[in-house]
Design a protein with these regions (language model features):
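Active-site microenvironment for binding and transforming phosphate-containing groups
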Residues: 1-178
Length: 178
């Protein structure tokens, strides 16, 4: 069983989201209980002790003031799941973005080198998280996410978007398949 702790993991924030009053964070590998380089592993499909992953997810949710971290089984798509109530799943469906108007939900997008995109319309109370790698970006995952937010009452001109840390072109080779 994973060691329980009140230690909360550190996280980064995007000024634009902070100024709008949206509670959010981009978490690093630090502050979890898993072994190895990725001690804050929150991936349910990872080769890690499920009890450790659950504890890590609880720590992230607690740091955000929520009861549970909600995430998806990410597949590098443009598919968006809209939540109008708190889900009861343990492992979410295959998609790459979550949108909700339910207060208190902690939406997560897991990333390493891909982009974690957080968006909010603070007036409408609509938030979103998206996992945007090169494939999802080329499939317009962000546009699909904003469209889903609008269907819940968000207005494009009020939506603020924060981009999390991600890999840059200088850090890897891009082949002719792009």
């Amino acid at each position: 069983m994973a060691e329980q702790s009140t230690t909360l993991p550190p996280f980064l924030t995007a000024s634009v989201l902070g100024f709008s009053g949206v509670k959010h964070g981009y978490f690093t590998r630090k502050g979890g209980v898993s072994w190895g380089r990725e001690d804050l592993n929150c991936g349910l499909g990872a080769d890690d002790d499920p009890a450790d992953v659950n504890e890590n997810r609880c720590r992230v949710a607690q740091a955000m003031g929520a009861a549970k971290l909600v995430s998806l089984y990410q597949v590098h798509s443009a598919d968006v799941v809209t939540l109008t109530q708190a889900p009861d799943w343990h492992r979410g469906p295959q998609a790459d973005a979550l949108v909700t108007n339910v207060p208190g939900l902690c939406l997560g997008a897991l990333s390493a080198d891909c982009g974690a995109v957080l968006a909010a319309d603070p007036v409408a109370g609509v938030i979103a998280s998206a996992h945007s790698g090169w494939k999802g970006t080329s499939l317009n995952i962000v546009r699909s996410t904003l469209d889903a937010m609008e269907r819940l009452g968000a207005r494009r001109e009020r939506i603020v978007v924060g981009l999390g840390p991600m890999i840059r072109q200088e850090s890897y080779e891009v082949g002719p398949d792009f």
